[in-house]
Amino acid sequence: MEVSMSLNALTRLPLKNTGRFEEVGLARHSLFSSRTACRETAVQQRRMVFVVEAKGKKGMAARQYQRTPPPMPKIEDDGNPRFVIFIRMANVYLWYPLSIIAGGTTAKIMVAAKDNLLGKYIYKDTIARNIAAVIYRDEKEIQKTAIKQHRVLRTATEFRYGYKLVENGNMRAALSTSDVIELPTQDQLKTVFDKVKDYFGDAKESFGKLSSLNPGSDEKTEETSDEKAKA
């Protein structure tokens, strides 16, 4: 009985300094506990936001990766070889597919002989020079077309050109930027162009006109030229 009375007395005694009851200590403890719980809740919310953002970025990357590639340009199989023309900035070794050029009878003979010893020399050297001659003849128009297709080339002031043979009608392999054969520059072409022309004929007879890889762009070019002629 005495013990219980002494305990009751202790719980009701005021503090010496403040005059408050000991329940203040319980209130402080409750306030500290609520602050800790709020901090933990805020941390958990931040973690949830981070997880949601990470999942969102991953989903966007997956959608970009699953984007369907552009359709392959259709080419007629008339027995003549086709070559994909590439362009790059002179100071950056990164090729961009530009157009397709069809070869004539002379080009067909060169391609047929490319697997023997003499044909390798003719194929790598003479075909390259003939294609380069066709390109440099209309280089300004070719550069305009290239800048429209690849905006990254707008800042370039000097270009290099290359080509790949379309083998077995495989356009996808021909459009890849690996194993592109670089064409000689205009200065290099002038040194031996006359000899090549005398032996193999004019480059214009060996190769047809350049065709754009984007369908409909040739029609737009022709319409523009007609409008300029009428004006």
Swiss-Prot record:
The keyword Protease does not apply. It holds the Pfam family HHL1-like. The chain crosses the membrane at residues 93-113. Induction: Not regulated at the transcription level by high light. Residues 206-231 are annotated as: Disordered. Residues 1-39 form a transit peptide. GO terms for molecular function: mRNA binding. Keywords: Chloroplast, Membrane, Plastid, Thylakoid, Transit peptide, Transmembrane, Transmembrane helix. It is a single-pass membrane protein. InterPro entries: HHL1-like. Residues 217-231 have a biased composition (Basic and acidic residues). Disruption phenotype: No visible phenotype, when grown under normal light conditions. Partial loss of PSII capacity after high-light stress. The keyword Chloroplast applies. One of its GO terms (cellular component) is chloroplast envelope. Involved in photoprotection. Forms a complex with LQY1 that is involved in the repair and reassembly cycle of the PSII-LHCII supercomplex under high-light conditions. May function in guiding the release of psbC from PSII core monomers. This is Protein HHL1, chloroplastic. It comes from Arabidopsis thaliana (Mouse-ear cress). The lineage of its organism: Eukaryota, Viridiplantae, Streptophyta, Embryophyta, Tracheophyta.
